[in-house]
Amino acid sequence: MDAGFCSKLQEQCFAIIGMGLIGGSYAKALRRLGVKNITGVDVNKNVLQQALADGVIDRAYENAGAYLAEADVIICCIYPKAVTEFLRQAAPFIKKGAVITDVSGRKGSLPYEAQQLVPEGAEFISGHPMAGRQGNGYDMSQAEIFNGANYIVVPTPANSKAAVNWLKNFALCLGCGHVEEITPESHDKIIAYTSNLPHAAAAALINSDRFSGQSCWFIGGGFRDVTRIADINASLWSDLFLENRENVLSELENFKTQIETLQKMINENNREGLQEFLQKAACHRKEIVL
């Protein structure tokens, strides 16, 4: 981490669009870094009042406006489909030299469209902090959410090397443990497996007809661990599943094949096959860098 880069952030003006779980966490992490000038934008007045009371933002607005002309960095922490609409409204106010980024869990054409919407001299560089937690909303936000997290920088050929490096350094200043650079198309394919599928599986497991008041008394750490992410923002995740439809459906088919393989081995009393299947899973789990 470049300490000099991090210290320079303290004098920059940040605008955070969307003060939910991730947006609120950005505000708190930036304040922890010593950033003195943070603007919060959200349609929810109560959230803005709470953030002001907490001292994590200095000004609050409900819509795009002239105040954005002061922002050196704009972080869009809103639904993927809302990013381009916001940028259309914000474009007349964004100053030359500003860096604009997002946190969207599905990229698709968003990075390309957003780059066309920002004014000349400003630059949109897409990003994705892998830093969620159970629950949603500003009340669940915390500065520590980025500590040790993976951060994905998702440039297009139109991005400058300077912007890519800026976002990488910014992620490290937040406390992220690893920064990866990848194309939007590859991002969506991999995220379908590492993020979309686990959330779908957790929701399916806890939505089983077997889930009941009585079954709750038979739940241990394993069930809690596997279903933790079923405490989900249903509106956001419906969008993420549908907008990444092709990749998600492909991963669901792959998962279905694994379940059918497991089912077949149990049905055939294939102990050797089961041991091999489970041992392979244990080995793969150990390969994950935590």
Where are these predicted regions, by residue range?
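Interdomain hinge/lid region at the active-site interface
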Residues: 213-281
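Conserved short alpha-helix immediately C-terminal to the canonical SAM/SAH-binding motif I
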Residues: 46-47, 82, 107-110
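Short beta->alpha hinge that forms the Motif I/post-I loop of the SAM-binding pocket
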Residues: 43, 78, 103-105
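NAD(P)+-binding Rossmann beta1-loop-alpha1 motif at the extreme N-terminus of oxidoreductases
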Residues: 2-64, 68-69
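Rossmann-like NAD(P)-binding element
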Residues: 64-99
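Internal alpha-helical scaffold of NAD(P)-dependent oxidoreductase catalytic cores
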Residues: 143-228
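Rossmann-like NAD(P)(H) cofactor-binding subdomain of soluble oxidoreductases
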Residues: 88-139
